C-alpha cells in the first residue's frame, strides 16, 4: 500500500504584550499544546518518543513583540484555513493569535532555511522615562546616508570592528519611531538593537536597550530586491 505524504502548512502568528518575555522553547511548547487542544490532525515523528512535526522560522530574542512570526507543520489531514485558524485562536490568549495558514507545495523548503530579512518598528518604551527617539529621528537622515556603519562585534575569544551597513536594507522614519529592514536568517543576520546602538552613537546620545521597544512587522524570503513574506510560499485552502 502506498504511503500518503503529510500535508505541509505554514502558520503565521503574533507575539504581543507581556508575552514578549516568553522564550522560544516555551513558545514551541505553547503551540504543541494549542494544536492538541484544537484537535488538529498533526503528524508525529516515528520512534519511541514521538513529537509533533513542527519547526519555527526565526526565533525572536526576549523582549521583542511581533506580528510576523511563522512556524511550519506537517498534518495528516486539514479542514480549511478559516476553520483551523478559529480552532487554534480559541485556545490561545489575545497576545498570541494566528493570522494566516497556508498550504505549501511538497517540495517547499523549511521556513528556517529560507528567511533572508525581517523588518522592525522601533519606538519609545512607555515604561521608561528616557525618550531619545526625537534625537534619533533628527540624526536619521545623516545616518541613512552613511556608506559605512561600524560596530564592535564581540565573540567568545575576541572583539572586532564590523561594517553592518550592507545588512541595513532600508531605514526611515515611521509613525513615532524608526522603521528598519534588516538582513535576517542563517546566511546574514543583523539584530535590530545593534542598529539602534549605532544610531545612538551617531546621534551622540547614550544607548540603553530598555529605552526602546522593538516590534517585528514581517519575516521575508528571497533576495534583497525581491523580498516576499514567508506566507507567499503557498495558498490558503
Segments from the language model and where they lie:
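Short, charge-patterned binding micro-sites
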Residues: 44-75
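Ordered, amphipathic secondary-structure segments that act as subunit-interaction surfaces
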Residues: 67-121
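Core RNA-modification/binding signature centered on pseudouridine synthases
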Residues: 142-237
